[in-house]
Amino acid sequence: MSTFLLEIGLEEVPAHLVTSSENQLIERTRNFLAEHRLTVGAINPYSTPRRLAVELTDVAEKSESLSEEKRGPSIERAKDANGEWTKAAMGFARGQGATPDDFETRDGYVWLTKHTEGVPAKDILVKIGAEVVSEMKFSTYMKWANNAFLYVRPIRWLVALFDKEVVDFHVLDVQTGRVTRGHRFLSNEHVEISSADDYVSKLESASVVVNAEVRKNAIRSQLTAIAKQNNWSLELDTDAAQNLLEEVNNIVEWPTAFAGTFDKKYLEIPDEVLITSMREHQRFFFVTNHDGKLLPHFLSVRNGNKEHLDNVIAGNEKVLVARLEDAEFFYKEDQTKTIADYMEKVKKLVFHEKIGTVYEHMQRTGVLAQALAQSLNFDEQQLSNVSRAAEIYKFDLMTGMVGEFDELQGIMGEHYAKLFGENPAVAAAIKEHYMPTSATGKIAESDIGAVLAVADKLDAIVTFFAADLTPSGSNDPYGLRRAATGIVRTLQEKNWHIALKPVLTQFAQSQGEVAAADITAVLEFILDRVRKLTLDDGVRQDLVSAGVSRSGNTDVVYLIDRINVLAAHSKDNDFRDVIESLTRVDRLAVKQLTNDSVDPSLFENDAEKELYQATYALNLSHLVKEGADEVYTTLAGLQSPISTYFEATMVNTENAAVKNNRYAQLNVIHRLISELGDLEQIVIK
């Protein structure tokens, strides 16, 4: 069996694009092989900052042959009255590269069997340049020379080998060959690959570890060894450390780890500042002692070997110290002012030119936060903390530290608030109001912080909607979808049952033109996030649609609950029977909605009485408070009497009084069904 190698040689690709580009190359190659019916043993990906590559092992000699049956026109349309082939039949034959002599007739139609022979592998692989390499898409492009062609970075060389033979094609003016490039500084620039199987070893001899996973494991091992040697504690399994490890891995081809040191005096700066300076700005790994206390050392990785490593360490230490000097200055300078001083500056900080200032945004957030807190029955101390947090929670935006390190907004707000004597609960809320910072990030831990986070995001959505600055398509420049996701997740994980419609309606009415949004549109926007989150959790589309639809209930926690309840019970043996019975009630009830006043004296059969006995004592509001599962269980218990009812009862009887009474009885059940959703959207399987 043969091996095929494709390498795309590039100018330095930004670290954050390397892994996604490698993944895209693999996916496009996989689709290419499937489309051409060419089987391989494995698809091995490789990448460095200067190259993307894929190796196909055990490549079949040729693609699989294919026989397809094509159905043509009916026999009546294929032949005329004289038994001659019609234009429709002749056109069908031409389209398939055949003649009517090749026709078969069965099942009232003419058929053709189209056989496609397998194609030699090399004749297929020569197309990979046009169908894979040239078709790749990126979030960032570069144009070079006089080409209209755009790519992540300029293509400088191409290697395409089928075993030992070059597969000839070109992209722009770059022709494939067998010559790659070694490490930019450590080896001879040009490296000849004699056979596709030699790719990894040839590059390793040229100081390039081309396998990204092997390279990452080497970095991890080197860092761990240095930490162990110095009795330091190094955390590499957090999300932040994993992201840094991925980034560092994508800026080196031959990794060599090293340790550096900085003056102990800088440890007086908050840990978050030191860590941000090291991790975010210098790509350094911080270390601690075994009690978790930050140490005046760091670990980093160079793209090279150990030669002149002392010079590299000294250079990195010098750059870090310059950063820390700035941080120390800002930290001391910020403490010479008060929160009130910073808030005066916040009053002039623009939130959005169509909406107003950050200070005005904070005031509106305070109104919303109080409304939410009161609906959650916060005590007096909690309400006081919510009020104070809302008054000051953006003050740190005007500090020198956040101006220099904008990643620290909220974090420095909490730290400074404590230094300035604020209640710890208020200080924590300042940090937490940004949470969650991603679709899967942690929500605010404290109740004060969570209320502030929800209120801050709600005001942003309402005011941006009022200013007609809503997301369109994939475009969401103000992060409103992320904000809505944060609202839903916070309410869900806190298990806070809040009817959003009355809260937002009253808020919009009280805040004038700046908040004069279509609240129905705002709520639908938030419900879209409910749909996405539950779909992402693996719930069926029809169950999500059913659970979100037809409800005046704008408590997102309850809506998520009923979606999950429908999903859980969809596996029950009687789910089909239950849903069919309930949707039959629904279809009839919505045609003639009446009040719930049922007169038992108008019953004409035992089935009506049985259904009445099963439903007359139902307390709708109580069942809803108990939760969606209680609603479903109650409705499922009605399946048998409903079935019996419809077998024995004609709802649309001629007697108007009896008919209306029957609709009233069905309407009792319909109102309860509505608390579970629009069950007609459920696809019964």
Swiss-Prot record:
<dbReference type="InterPro" id="IPR015944">
    <property type="entry name" value="Gly-tRNA-synth_bsu"/>
</dbReference>
<keyword id="KW-0963">Cytoplasm</keyword>
<dbReference type="GO" id="GO:0005524">
    <property type="term" value="F:ATP binding"/>
</dbReference>
<keyword id="KW-0648">Protein biosynthesis</keyword>
<dbReference type="GO" id="GO:0004820">
    <property type="term" value="F:glycine-tRNA ligase activity"/>
</dbReference>
<dbReference type="GO" id="GO:0006426">
    <property type="term" value="P:glycyl-tRNA aminoacylation"/>
</dbReference>
<keyword id="KW-0547">Nucleotide-binding</keyword>
<keyword id="KW-0436">Ligase</keyword>
<dbReference type="InterPro" id="IPR006194">
    <property type="entry name" value="Gly-tRNA-synth_heterodimer"/>
</dbReference>
<keyword id="KW-0030">Aminoacyl-tRNA synthetase</keyword>
<comment type="similarity">
    <text>Belongs to the class-II aminoacyl-tRNA synthetase family.</text>
</comment>
<keyword id="KW-0067">ATP-binding</keyword>
<comment type="subunit">
    <text>Tetramer of two alpha and two beta subunits.</text>
</comment>
<protein>
    <recommendedName>
        <fullName>Glycine--tRNA ligase beta subunit</fullName>
        <ecNumber>6.1.1.14</ecNumber>
    </recommendedName>
</protein>
<dbReference type="GO" id="GO:0005829">
    <property type="term" value="C:cytosol"/>
</dbReference>
<dbReference type="Pfam" id="PF02092">
    <property type="entry name" value="tRNA_synt_2f"/>
</dbReference>
